[in-house]
Amino acid sequence: VNRFCSSGLQTIAMAANSIRSDGSDCIVAGGAESISIPGGGSPKESIDPELLKVAPDIFMAMIDTADIVAERYKVSREYQDEYSLESQRRMAAAQQANKFKDEIVPMKTKMKVVDKATKAESIVDYVVDRDECNRPETTMEGLAKLEPVKGAGKYVTAGNASQLSDG
């Protein structure tokens, strides 16, 4: 199933439908997306060239979509930064209070670590047991200093958008 960000949700909906209509007792479903694979995880062969001729914006990146929506509905950069800051604060408070403890199953994995000084790479054992992409130290001043990804006059920055990650 290739539904980009909604792939996991799509497979869960398909599983639920199968349980309801086909009488399956139990189905395991889920998904992951990849931002590190060129093309955002979409193999070139999965993009229909004929469809692109008819609807060239069909595979538009979310950054472009977000900038268009912000422009259309007059959602200012400052408002987006304020919302982002509040979201960071809420996430930090929820993590501090262990609100997600029962929602995340710890997973053992391997992680590549790159030494910033020497650029030496190593692989280490790692346990993922929490969302790690939030930044509780975020400030309005810090957010305001970030340049928009698509250049001056645009809205989306590394501080007011979701992180780029595989998962």
What is the predicted function of each stretch?
Residues 1-25, 45, 56-64, 136-163:
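Conserved catalytic cysteine-centered active-site region
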Residues 15, 37-38, 105:
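Residue-level recognition of conserved structural "scaffold" positions that shape functional pockets
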Residues 3-32, 70-99, 167:
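Active-site-proximal alpha-helical scaffold in enzymes
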Residues 82-167:
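N-terminal extracellular/periplasmic Venus flytrap/periplasmic-binding protein-like
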Residues 41-78:
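A glycine/threonine-rich phosphate-anchoring loop and its flanking beta-alpha core
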Residues 35, 66, 110-114:
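Generic structural motif
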Residues 37-43, 118-119:
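Short acidic, glycine/serine/threonine-rich loops at helix termini
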